[in-house]
Amino acid sequence: MTRNDPSRTIAAPTGTTLNAKSWQTEAPLRMLMNNLHPDVAERPQELVVYGGIGRAARDWESFDAIVETLKRLDDDQTLLVQSGKPVGVFRTHADAPRVLIANSNLVPRWANWDHFNELDKKGLAMYGQMTAGSWIYIGAQGIVQGTYETFVEMGRQHFGGDLTGKWLFTGGLGGMGGAQPLAAVMAGASCLAVECRKSSIDMRLRTGYLDTWTDNLDEALRLIDESCKAGTPKSVGLLGNVADVLAELLKRGVKPDLLTDQTSAHDPVNGYLPQGWTVEQWDDKRVSAPKEVEKAARASMANHIRAMLGFHALGVPTVDYGNNLRQMALEEGVENAFDFPGFVPAYIRPLFCRGIGPFRWAALSGDPEDIAKTDAKVKELIPDNPHLHRWLDMAAEKIKFQGLPARICWVGLGDRDRLGQAFNEMVANGELKAPVVIGRDHLDSGSVASPNRETEAMADGSDAVSDWPLLNALLNTASGATWVSLHHGGGVGMGFSQHAGMVIVCDGTEAAAKRIGRVLWNDPATGVMRHADAGYEIAIDCAKEKGLDLPGILG
């Protein structure tokens, strides 16, 4: 089992020459490879895409076997992938998924990091995060609009809709957290983001998500103060330990205007640098003494939350951004760790009630012009949404593509299927140079059960009910998605979430059009269904407006 191979450099093929038998199998092949592009993945030589140890394949032998299998797969066959390892090819039919993926799933009694890590060491499991093991990660852009929407809503609720002269403090510049600086600037706020790894800071600078960096707190605060006084938002990366820095700010009485965190706290061994440790010491001990790392990291997380609670008590809008930091602190004795809310119940849930979430697509041609054309098509088909148009304009101006050109665009039920059909038609008539794939984050309205994140504080108390992502995966399979995934532990770690993903190929064929119509209607409809069942009036009204047949919910 080879987990680390520095000789490997992976990039997705582009253009119209097929390496597999059809676009239905070429698409997952390219997206798997795209997940490991050097500008996309955090540690591609280790198959780690983002989120601590979120991998695209279990090991390099499994990666090679997946690639070779996809190349020979017929359009009436389905490949089964078990925790990043290809385990079977079965005859199905043309409208069935070409790939079905199950990652990191454990029987609930054993669903914890200790048991998972034992399996992982033996080569029997792989942590798939959300879009790492489901082959639809598109770099930091994949989370940037959701982060932007959150920051805009924070500005609306707390500052009258204007973040000019305000600044956000946060931690973590990895694959998810790396979106925060650009999202803050897009929303009109400056951002001070603390990151312990210089390589992560360098990647955000290289890919345009961060404006500048320093290793000196006083210099960082000077840069933030200058940008706020000038009313010109700027993002500053600070090399350091976020728990140390936040405690120092509290001690000095330096108050940010907004406060959150996106370190990989969900994984106390691989995701969070303990206070007083060097990165080199951490990297060594993660392998040689993981329990020592976990103990020290958890203690540091508790200190981190205590500092966040200190600012919360001072009236600073403070929000958990879904990394389970509060839970870790609670388990370390911080009894009031949940005094501040998670970002979904505080700012995002009304969108989920209408099936609105992180719709994304990638151009398999590799040509950025294909994304420009699809951006224009979105504006054409959704003409009366100036907020969406502003997002697309900002994205075109400010977001650098990582790997295959791609776009994230939060739209909901009734729009996703129309856009998918339009993209498919653009492929058919040659307007796009090659097919596109449409997918989404597992963080969506109907595809996840995560009581400390997406389903926190549900109106009916159904936070932990995980039937919903299972139904979502089953329905997307029945509807004909090109690949479907079912994962455990993404975002918040082992034992705290179950979630499903789907991707569908727009190859310009009539058969694809039928699948697209089913999948891109049914997928967001499950989110409306789930929230209507929980009693949200917005979701109930949306279900009625869209004519959903929900017999046990609407009566």
Swiss-Prot record:
Keywords for the protein's UniProt record, in alphabetical order: Cytoplasm, Histidine metabolism, Lyase, NAD
Free-text remark on how the cofactor is bound: Binds 1 NAD(+) per subunit.
PROSITE patterns membership: UROCANASE (PS01233)
Binding site for NAD(+): 51-52, 129, 175-177, 195, 262-266, 272-273, 321, 491
Catalytic activity: 4-imidazolone-5-propanoate = trans-urocanate + H2O
Gene Ontology biological process terms, A to Z: L-histidine catabolic process to glutamate and formamide; L-histidine catabolic process to glutamate and formate
Catalytic site positions: 409
EC number(s) per entry: 4.2.1.49
GO cellular component: cytoplasm
Alphabetized InterPro entries for the sequence: Urocanase, Urocanase-like, Urocanase_C, Urocanase_central_sf, Urocanase_CS, Urocanase_N, Urocanase_Rossmann-like, Urocanase_sf
Subcellular location per the Swiss-Prot or TrEMBL entry: Cytoplasm
Pathway(s) of this molecule: Amino-acid degradation; L-histidine degradation into L-glutamate; N-formimidoyl-L-glutamate from L-histidine: step 2/3
Cofactors (names): NAD(+)
First-level EC class: lyase
An annotated Gene Ontology molecular function: urocanate hydratase activity
Family, as annotated: Belongs to the urocanase family.
Function in brief: Catalyzes the conversion of urocanate to 4-imidazolone-5-propionate.
Protein name: Urocanate hydratase
Lineage start: Bacteria, Pseudomonadati, Pseudomonadota, Gammaproteobacteria, Lysobacterales
Encoding gene, per UniProt annotation: hutU
